[in-house]
UniProtKB/Swiss-Prot annotation:
HAMAP family: QueA (MF_00113). GO terms for cellular component: cytoplasm. It comes from the Bacteria. It catalyses: 7-aminomethyl-7-carbaguanosine(34) in tRNA + S-adenosyl-L-methionine = epoxyqueuosine(34) in tRNA + adenine + L-methionine + 2 H(+). Belongs to the QueA family. It holds the Pfam family Queuosine_synth. It comes from Azotobacter vinelandii (strain DJ / ATCC BAA-1303). InterPro entries: QueA, QueA_dom1, QueA_dom2, QueA_sf. This is S-adenosylmethionine:tRNA ribosyltransferase-isomerase. The lineage of its organism: Bacteria, Pseudomonadati, Pseudomonadota, Gammaproteobacteria, Pseudomonadales. Transfers and isomerizes the ribose moiety from AdoMet to the 7-aminomethyl group of 7-deazaguanine (preQ1-tRNA) to give epoxyqueuosine (oQ-tRNA). Pathway: tRNA modification; tRNA-queuosine biosynthesis. NCBIfam families: PRK00147.1, queA.
Protein backbone atom coordinates (compact mmCIF):
# COMPACT_ATOMS: atom_id res chain seq x y z
CA UNK A 1 0.00 0.00 0.00
CA UNK A 2 1.14 3.51 -0.79
CA UNK A 3 1.17 6.28 1.78
CA UNK A 4 -0.17 8.56 -0.97
CA UNK A 5 -3.39 6.51 -0.98
CA UNK A 6 -4.24 8.21 2.31
CA UNK A 7 -3.92 11.76 1.07
CA UNK A 8 -6.83 14.17 1.07
CA UNK A 9 -7.09 17.91 0.57
CA UNK A 10 -7.86 19.86 3.72
CA UNK A 11 -8.51 23.61 3.69
CA UNK A 12 -6.50 25.47 6.34
CA UNK A 13 -9.74 27.01 7.59
CA UNK A 14 -10.93 23.60 8.85
CA UNK A 15 -7.99 23.13 11.25
CA UNK A 16 -9.32 23.85 14.75
CA UNK A 17 -6.87 26.11 16.58
CA UNK A 18 -8.99 26.64 19.69
CA UNK A 19 -11.48 24.39 21.47
CA UNK A 20 -15.19 25.15 21.51
CA UNK A 21 -16.65 26.75 24.63
CA UNK A 22 -18.20 23.43 25.73
CA UNK A 23 -16.51 20.05 25.36
CA UNK A 24 -19.51 18.16 24.02
CA UNK A 25 -20.62 20.93 21.66
CA UNK A 26 -18.51 19.38 18.89
CA UNK A 27 -20.08 17.73 15.89
CA UNK A 28 -20.14 13.95 15.55
CA UNK A 29 -19.95 12.10 12.23
CA UNK A 30 -21.36 8.60 12.68
CA UNK A 31 -20.08 5.92 10.30
CA UNK A 32 -21.86 2.57 10.20
CA UNK A 33 -19.13 0.02 9.53
CA UNK A 34 -21.55 -2.50 8.05
CA UNK A 35 -23.46 -0.28 5.61
CA UNK A 36 -21.09 2.66 5.20
CA UNK A 37 -23.98 5.03 5.97
CA UNK A 38 -23.18 8.42 7.52
CA UNK A 39 -25.12 10.49 10.06
CA UNK A 40 -24.33 14.08 10.99
CA UNK A 41 -24.93 14.55 14.72
CA UNK A 42 -23.69 16.40 17.81
CA UNK A 43 -21.24 14.83 20.23
CA UNK A 44 -23.84 14.87 23.00
CA UNK A 45 -25.85 12.50 20.76
CA UNK A 46 -23.20 9.82 21.31
CA UNK A 47 -25.54 8.40 23.96
CA UNK A 48 -27.98 7.44 21.20
CA UNK A 49 -25.35 5.15 19.71
CA UNK A 50 -24.36 3.37 22.92
CA UNK A 51 -26.21 0.34 24.23
CA UNK A 52 -26.71 -0.95 27.78
CA UNK A 53 -24.01 -3.55 28.35
CA UNK A 54 -21.38 -1.80 26.24
CA UNK A 55 -17.94 -1.08 27.68
CA UNK A 56 -16.17 2.21 26.97
CA UNK A 57 -12.39 2.13 27.34
CA UNK A 58 -10.67 5.47 27.98
CA UNK A 59 -6.99 6.44 28.10
CA UNK A 60 -6.34 8.16 31.44
CA UNK A 61 -2.90 9.54 30.61
CA UNK A 62 -2.27 13.12 31.72
CA UNK A 63 -0.51 15.63 29.46
CA UNK A 64 2.49 17.24 31.13
CA UNK A 65 3.55 20.83 30.31
CA UNK A 66 6.44 19.30 28.40
CA UNK A 67 7.80 22.31 26.50
CA UNK A 68 10.59 24.31 28.14
CA UNK A 69 12.53 27.32 26.94
CA UNK A 70 16.04 28.21 27.99
CA UNK A 71 19.58 28.68 26.82
CA UNK A 72 22.91 26.92 26.89
CA UNK A 73 25.27 28.07 29.64
CA UNK A 74 27.75 28.79 26.84
CA UNK A 75 25.16 30.98 25.10
CA UNK A 76 22.41 30.40 22.55
CA UNK A 77 18.68 29.93 23.03
CA UNK A 78 17.06 26.52 22.85
CA UNK A 79 13.74 24.76 23.22
CA UNK A 80 13.18 21.44 24.99
CA UNK A 81 10.27 19.09 24.38
CA UNK A 82 10.23 16.27 26.91
CA UNK A 83 9.41 12.98 25.20
CA UNK A 84 9.60 10.63 28.17
CA UNK A 85 10.20 10.97 31.90
CA UNK A 86 12.76 8.32 32.92
CA UNK A 87 12.81 8.95 36.68
CA UNK A 88 12.42 11.83 39.13
CA UNK A 89 15.21 13.87 37.54
CA UNK A 90 15.99 12.39 34.09
CA UNK A 91 14.14 12.68 30.80
CA UNK A 92 14.51 11.91 27.13
CA UNK A 93 13.80 15.04 25.14
CA UNK A 94 13.93 16.71 21.76
CA UNK A 95 16.20 19.76 21.86
CA UNK A 96 15.94 22.47 19.23
CA UNK A 97 18.93 24.81 19.06
CA UNK A 98 21.24 26.37 16.50
CA UNK A 99 23.90 23.89 17.68
CA UNK A 100 23.04 20.75 19.61
CA UNK A 101 24.32 20.66 23.21
CA UNK A 102 27.23 18.33 23.90
CA UNK A 103 27.45 15.72 26.63
CA UNK A 104 28.21 17.36 29.96
CA UNK A 105 26.98 20.81 28.92
CA UNK A 106 24.66 22.83 31.17
CA UNK A 107 21.26 24.13 30.13
CA UNK A 108 19.59 26.98 31.99
CA UNK A 109 15.79 26.86 32.14
CA UNK A 110 13.65 29.95 31.70
CA UNK A 111 11.75 30.46 34.95
CA UNK A 112 14.35 28.73 37.11
CA UNK A 113 16.28 25.48 37.22
CA UNK A 114 18.91 23.88 35.05
CA UNK A 115 19.73 20.59 33.38
CA UNK A 116 22.80 18.72 32.23
CA UNK A 117 23.01 16.92 28.92
CA UNK A 118 24.10 13.36 29.72
CA UNK A 119 23.99 11.57 26.37
CA UNK A 120 22.40 11.53 22.95
CA UNK A 121 20.24 8.62 21.80
CA UNK A 122 19.60 9.11 18.08
CA UNK A 123 17.23 12.10 17.85
CA UNK A 124 16.66 12.31 21.61
CA UNK A 125 18.79 13.85 24.34
CA UNK A 126 19.06 12.42 27.84
CA UNK A 127 18.88 15.28 30.32
CA UNK A 128 19.22 15.37 34.11
CA UNK A 129 17.60 18.26 35.97
CA UNK A 130 18.73 19.74 39.26
CA UNK A 131 15.31 19.07 40.78
CA UNK A 132 12.28 16.81 40.38
CA UNK A 133 11.08 16.99 36.81
CA UNK A 134 7.29 16.92 37.10
CA UNK A 135 6.98 19.78 39.63
CA UNK A 136 9.42 21.81 37.50
CA UNK A 137 7.33 21.25 34.39
CA UNK A 138 4.13 22.19 36.21
CA UNK A 139 5.78 25.40 37.38
CA UNK A 140 7.56 26.68 34.26
CA UNK A 141 6.59 24.34 31.42
CA UNK A 142 4.28 25.09 28.51
CA UNK A 143 1.56 22.81 27.16
CA UNK A 144 2.95 20.98 24.10
CA UNK A 145 0.34 21.96 21.54
CA UNK A 146 0.63 20.09 18.22
CA UNK A 147 2.58 21.78 15.41
CA UNK A 148 -0.58 22.41 13.38
CA UNK A 149 -1.96 24.62 16.18
CA UNK A 150 0.24 27.49 15.12
CA UNK A 151 -0.11 29.77 18.12
CA UNK A 152 1.53 30.07 21.55
CA UNK A 153 -0.07 28.04 24.31
CA UNK A 154 -2.52 29.89 26.54
CA UNK A 155 -3.58 29.48 30.16
CA UNK A 156 -6.83 27.84 29.02
CA UNK A 157 -4.89 25.06 27.29
CA UNK A 158 -3.83 23.72 30.70
CA UNK A 159 -7.45 22.67 31.18
CA UNK A 160 -8.77 22.13 27.67
CA UNK A 161 -5.80 20.18 26.21
CA UNK A 162 -6.50 17.63 28.95
CA UNK A 163 -9.29 15.11 29.49
CA UNK A 164 -11.47 15.54 32.58
CA UNK A 165 -10.44 12.04 33.73
CA UNK A 166 -6.68 12.46 33.19
CA UNK A 167 -4.89 10.76 36.08
CA UNK A 168 -1.41 9.47 35.23
CA UNK A 169 1.12 12.10 34.14
CA UNK A 170 3.40 11.28 31.23
CA UNK A 171 1.89 12.20 27.85
CA UNK A 172 3.22 14.98 25.64
CA UNK A 173 0.12 14.96 23.46
CA UNK A 174 -3.51 14.58 24.46
CA UNK A 175 -5.63 11.52 23.67
CA UNK A 176 -7.88 13.90 21.81
CA UNK A 177 -11.07 11.82 21.43
CA UNK A 178 -11.42 12.11 25.19
CA UNK A 179 -11.45 15.91 25.09
CA UNK A 180 -15.15 15.85 24.13
CA UNK A 181 -16.30 14.22 27.37
CA UNK A 182 -17.38 16.30 30.36
CA UNK A 183 -18.50 15.09 33.79
CA UNK A 184 -22.18 15.32 32.89
CA UNK A 185 -21.78 13.18 29.77
CA UNK A 186 -19.77 10.59 31.69
CA UNK A 187 -22.51 10.45 34.32
CA UNK A 188 -25.16 10.00 31.62
CA UNK A 189 -23.14 7.16 30.10
CA UNK A 190 -23.13 5.40 33.47
CA UNK A 191 -26.87 5.93 33.88
CA UNK A 192 -27.38 4.11 30.57
CA UNK A 193 -25.68 1.03 32.06
CA UNK A 194 -22.63 1.44 29.90
CA UNK A 195 -19.52 0.31 31.78
CA UNK A 196 -16.19 2.14 31.73
CA UNK A 197 -12.57 1.07 32.06
CA UNK A 198 -9.25 2.88 31.83
CA UNK A 199 -5.97 2.03 30.14
CA UNK A 200 -2.88 4.23 30.12
CA UNK A 201 -0.82 5.08 27.06
CA UNK A 202 1.58 8.00 27.39
CA UNK A 203 1.27 9.62 23.96
CA UNK A 204 4.65 10.70 22.59
CA UNK A 205 5.64 13.48 20.23
CA UNK A 206 6.20 10.83 17.58
CA UNK A 207 2.46 10.78 17.01
CA UNK A 208 2.93 13.98 14.96
CA UNK A 209 5.85 12.71 12.88
CA UNK A 210 5.08 12.28 9.18
CA UNK A 211 5.43 8.93 7.46
CA UNK A 212 8.64 9.30 5.45
CA UNK A 213 8.44 6.19 3.27
CA UNK A 214 6.44 5.58 0.12
CA UNK A 215 5.06 2.20 1.10
CA UNK A 216 3.23 1.70 4.37
CA UNK A 217 4.86 -1.66 5.01
CA UNK A 218 8.28 0.02 5.26
CA UNK A 219 7.24 2.37 8.09
CA UNK A 220 8.47 1.79 11.65
CA UNK A 221 6.34 3.18 14.45
CA UNK A 222 7.68 5.15 17.39
CA UNK A 223 7.52 3.46 20.80
CA UNK A 224 5.15 4.51 23.56
CA UNK A 225 4.61 3.17 27.08
CA UNK A 226 1.24 1.68 27.97
CA UNK A 227 -0.48 -0.33 30.65
CA UNK A 228 -3.55 -2.54 30.41
CA UNK A 229 -4.42 -3.85 33.86
CA UNK A 230 -6.17 -7.03 34.95
CA UNK A 231 -9.27 -4.96 35.74
CA UNK A 232 -9.50 -3.99 32.06
CA UNK A 233 -9.12 -7.61 30.96
CA UNK A 234 -11.89 -8.59 33.39
CA UNK A 235 -14.12 -5.74 32.20
CA UNK A 236 -13.74 -6.82 28.57
CA UNK A 237 -14.53 -10.44 29.48
CA UNK A 238 -17.65 -9.32 31.38
CA UNK A 239 -18.71 -7.18 28.42
CA UNK A 240 -18.36 -10.12 26.06
CA UNK A 241 -20.33 -12.36 28.43
CA UNK A 242 -23.31 -9.97 28.46
CA UNK A 243 -23.21 -9.44 24.69
CA UNK A 244 -21.93 -5.88 24.80
CA UNK A 245 -19.49 -4.06 22.55
CA UNK A 246 -16.03 -2.78 23.44
CA UNK A 247 -16.00 0.92 22.49
CA UNK A 248 -12.51 2.41 22.41
CA UNK A 249 -12.30 6.13 23.08
CA UNK A 250 -9.45 7.22 20.85
CA UNK A 251 -6.82 5.51 18.75
CA UNK A 252 -4.54 5.30 21.80
CA UNK A 253 -7.11 3.10 23.54
CA UNK A 254 -7.29 0.96 20.39
CA UNK A 255 -3.51 0.61 20.27
CA UNK A 256 -3.41 -0.25 23.98
CA UNK A 257 -6.03 -2.98 23.77
CA UNK A 258 -4.76 -4.47 20.54
CA UNK A 259 -1.15 -4.38 21.81
CA UNK A 260 -2.27 -6.43 24.80
CA UNK A 261 -3.99 -8.93 22.49
CA UNK A 262 -1.46 -9.40 19.69
CA UNK A 263 -1.95 -13.17 19.71
CA UNK A 264 -5.72 -12.83 19.82
CA UNK A 265 -6.08 -13.15 23.60
CA UNK A 266 -6.30 -10.06 25.80
CA UNK A 267 -3.91 -10.20 28.74
CA UNK A 268 -2.55 -7.64 31.21
CA UNK A 269 0.35 -5.77 29.68
CA UNK A 270 2.77 -3.09 30.83
CA UNK A 271 5.61 -1.84 28.65
CA UNK A 272 6.43 -0.26 25.32
CA UNK A 273 4.46 -0.78 22.14
CA UNK A 274 5.29 0.00 18.53
CA UNK A 275 2.13 -1.55 17.12
CA UNK A 276 1.26 -0.25 13.66
CA UNK A 277 -2.34 -0.86 12.63
CA UNK A 278 -3.08 -0.41 8.94
CA UNK A 279 -5.51 -2.02 6.46
CA UNK A 280 -5.26 -5.78 6.52
CA UNK A 281 -4.51 -6.10 10.21
CA UNK A 282 -7.26 -7.83 12.25
CA UNK A 283 -8.82 -6.39 15.40
CA UNK A 284 -9.12 -8.75 18.35
CA UNK A 285 -10.82 -6.55 20.96
CA UNK A 286 -12.39 -3.32 19.69
CA UNK A 287 -15.91 -3.23 18.22
CA UNK A 288 -16.54 0.52 17.98
CA UNK A 289 -14.39 3.63 18.05
CA UNK A 290 -14.69 7.28 19.05
CA UNK A 291 -11.98 9.29 17.33
CA UNK A 292 -11.13 12.75 16.04
CA UNK A 293 -10.29 13.57 12.41
CA UNK A 294 -6.65 12.87 11.61
CA UNK A 295 -3.94 14.29 9.37
CA UNK A 296 -3.63 13.27 5.71
CA UNK A 297 -1.23 10.35 5.19
CA UNK A 298 -0.95 9.76 8.95
CA UNK A 299 -0.68 6.42 10.72
CA UNK A 300 -3.86 7.26 12.64
CA UNK A 301 -5.84 7.68 9.42
CA UNK A 302 -4.45 4.30 8.38
CA UNK A 303 -5.70 2.81 11.67
CA UNK A 304 -9.18 4.20 11.08
CA UNK A 305 -9.12 2.80 7.53
CA UNK A 306 -8.18 -0.61 8.89
CA UNK A 307 -11.17 -0.43 11.24
CA UNK A 308 -13.84 1.05 8.99
CA UNK A 309 -12.53 0.08 5.55
CA UNK A 310 -10.48 2.28 3.25
CA UNK A 311 -13.21 3.42 0.82
CA UNK A 312 -15.66 4.08 3.66
CA UNK A 313 -13.10 6.09 5.62
CA UNK A 314 -12.02 8.25 2.70
CA UNK A 315 -15.66 8.85 1.73
CA UNK A 316 -16.42 9.90 5.30
CA UNK A 317 -13.48 12.30 5.32
CA UNK A 318 -14.59 13.79 2.00
CA UNK A 319 -18.06 14.33 3.48
CA UNK A 320 -16.55 15.91 6.60
CA UNK A 321 -14.55 18.37 4.52
CA UNK A 322 -17.58 19.21 2.39
CA UNK A 323 -19.71 19.77 5.50
CA UNK A 324 -17.11 21.97 7.20
CA UNK A 325 -16.19 19.73 10.13
CA UNK A 326 -13.33 20.95 12.33
CA UNK A 327 -10.19 18.81 12.13
CA UNK A 328 -7.44 17.53 14.43
CA UNK A 329 -6.90 17.83 18.20
CA UNK A 330 -9.40 20.58 19.02
CA UNK A 331 -11.76 19.52 16.24
CA UNK A 332 -14.85 17.37 15.82
CA UNK A 333 -15.23 13.61 16.25
CA UNK A 334 -16.43 10.39 14.66
CA UNK A 335 -18.22 7.36 16.06
CA UNK A 336 -17.43 4.27 13.99
CA UNK A 337 -18.63 0.69 14.26
CA UNK A 338 -16.20 -1.90 12.95
CA UNK A 339 -16.46 -3.04 9.35
CA UNK A 340 -16.58 -6.86 9.37
CA UNK A 341 -14.94 -7.03 5.92
CA UNK A 342 -12.79 -3.91 5.51
CA UNK A 343 -11.14 -3.34 2.15
CA UNK A 344 -7.63 -1.98 1.66
CA UNK A 345 -6.69 0.47 -1.13
CA UNK A 346 -5.59 -2.21 -3.62
CA UNK A 347 -8.90 -3.99 -3.17
CA UNK A 348 -10.90 -0.88 -3.94
CA UNK A 349 -12.45 -0.97 -7.43
Amino acid sequence: MRVADFHFELPESLIARHPLAERRASRLLVLDGVTGDLQHRRFADLLDHLRPGDLMVFNNTRVIPARLFGWKASGGKLEILVERVLDDERVLAHVRASKSPKAGSRILIEGGGEAQMLARHDALFELRFDQRVLPLLERVGHMPLPPYIDRPDEAADRERYQTVYAARAGAVAAPTAGLHFDEALLAAIGEKDVATAFVTLHVGAGTFQPVRVERIEDHHMHREWLEVGQEVVDAVAACRARGGRVVAVGTTSVRSLESAARDGVLRPFSGDTDIFIYPGRPFHVVDALVTNFHLPESTLLMLVSAFAGYPETMAAYAAAVAQGYRFFSYGDAMFITRNPAPRAPEETP
